[in-house]
Amino acid sequence: YSKWVGTPYRYGGQTSRGIDCSALMVKVFGDAFNRQLPRTTIQQVKVGKAISKRHLQIGDLIFFKTGWNKRHVGVYMGKGQFFHASVSKGVTISRLDKPYWAKRYWQSRRVI
């Protein structure tokens, strides 16, 4: 995953010049786990098994509602952290307990 850190966010982007959150999950899961995911967040939220926030394990997908009809996805890294493509920060690591993310948490899925 480290090769992606610092990559700028670009809606619809799929390369190191700019990537969005769901494309980042496609790339990371393909490279790290040899697992093919669908391209969009709305498709990804249907994959795997729903799990509760308190049962998160490394590699679980975490979904957020970030606005009316807007969804965001990241991958859990353990110790309350997740890896994602942030609109404001690009590809970064954030904490689930930060108020912004805690209040927007939607659901989690185990796909590996």
Where are these regions (language model features)?
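Conserved hydrophobic/aromatic beta-strand scaffold that supports enzyme active sites
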Residues: L61, V73-V75
